[in-house]
Structures are given as C-alpha cells and as structure tokens.
C-alpha cells in the first residue's frame, strides 16, 4: 500500500507460503513470491527488483536467494531484527552487482508524522483484527504462533462510566 502510494511501478510481496497471496494482492501488490512453495522462485525472479525491504526476523531467512532478486545497484534494506546474526553470504555477489545492504528502524517522529499524513491523503487503512482486552494473554499466544492477520488491536471491553 505504501510502496504504491510512494510511486513504485511494481510491488512484489514475498512470504514463505501462498497463504498470504490473496491478501497481499488485495493490498495492492502486483505479484507474489512463495519461497517455500515454489522451489525455483529465486531463479524465476532473478534480477527483478530494485529494492527489497526485508521484514524477516528469522536468522534462517534465505538471504543469498534474496540477494539474487536484486538488479544491478539494487538494495536490500533490513527492518526485521533477527534474534541471531544474519545468514552468511558471499560478498562477491554484492560487488559484482554494485548492490547494497542497509538497515532502517521505525523512523524519527517527523518521518512517522509524514507517513501518517501520506496514509490519510491516500486513504491507506491498516489491516487489523480487534481482540477484547480480556483475551490479551490469548492474543499474545496467537501472535507468537503467527495467527495474527495482520495486527492485533486490544479493545477495552469494560463499560464506560
């Protein structure tokens, strides 16, 4: 949604399985890659992306294959924070393409304000699932089990005084 709002020509969603495909396309992506369901995904999509924003937080992510998706002078920006170090890769693959790896945090207050302004201007709405506050513990367990689609919002279920 934000990539399109910022003028991206083509947006590709990437996840392990096809389970999120329909949602990703509804959010505005033009294409979808399932890394565990399609064994040749990196060959089929080699050198097809200028920018890859990686939200993966697993040290088991297929980093070498992600780097193969980058075009010459492409960039991989890591925003997910793995619990351990990133997987190893051959630096030569970056040098030959002139590719870069970088990182980014959530942003400063001004950038967050700009993002919210853009969201309002382009009518970008979050995909959330409301959960009652009384089920907060269950929501945490469900979130850790990967059941959240895509953010849980805890709602106070106490009557207003």
Would you name each region that the model predicts?
Residues 16-23, 85-91, 111-112:
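Short, glycine/polar-rich helix-capping loops at beta-to-alpha or helix-loop-helix junctions
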Residues 52-53, 77:
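N-terminal Rossmann-like NAD(P) cofactor-binding module of classical short-chain dehydrogenase/reductase
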Residues 1-37:
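Mid-domain Rossmann-like dinucleotide-binding core that forms the NAD(H)/NADP(H) cofactor-binding site
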Residues 43-50:
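A short acidic, Gly/Pro-enriched loop at the edge of an enzyme's catalytic core
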Residues 64, 109-161:
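C-terminal hydrophobic helical "lid"/dimerization subdomain
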Residues 75-77, 89-129:
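Rossmann-fold dehydrogenase core element
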């Amino acid at each position: 949604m934000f990539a399109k709002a910022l003028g991206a020509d083509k947006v590709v969603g990437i996840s392990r399985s096809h389970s999120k495909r329909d949602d990703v396309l509804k959010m505005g992506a033009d294409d979808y890659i399932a890394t565990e369901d399609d064994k040749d995904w990196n060959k089929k999509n080699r050198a097809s992306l200028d920018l890859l924003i990686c939200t993966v937080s697993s040290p088991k992510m297929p980093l070498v294959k992600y780097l193969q998706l980058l075009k010459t002078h492409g960039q991989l920006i890591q925003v997910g924070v793995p619990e351990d170090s990133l997987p190893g890769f051959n630096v030569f693959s970056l040098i030959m393409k002139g590719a870069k790896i970088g990182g980014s945090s959530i942003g400063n207050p001004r950038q967050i304000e700009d993002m919210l302004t853009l969201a309002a201007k382009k009518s970008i709405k979050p995909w959330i699932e409301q959960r009652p506050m009384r089920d907060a513990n269950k929501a945490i367990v469900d979130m850790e089990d990967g059941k959240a689609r895509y953010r849980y919002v805890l709602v106070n279920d106490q009557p207003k005084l």
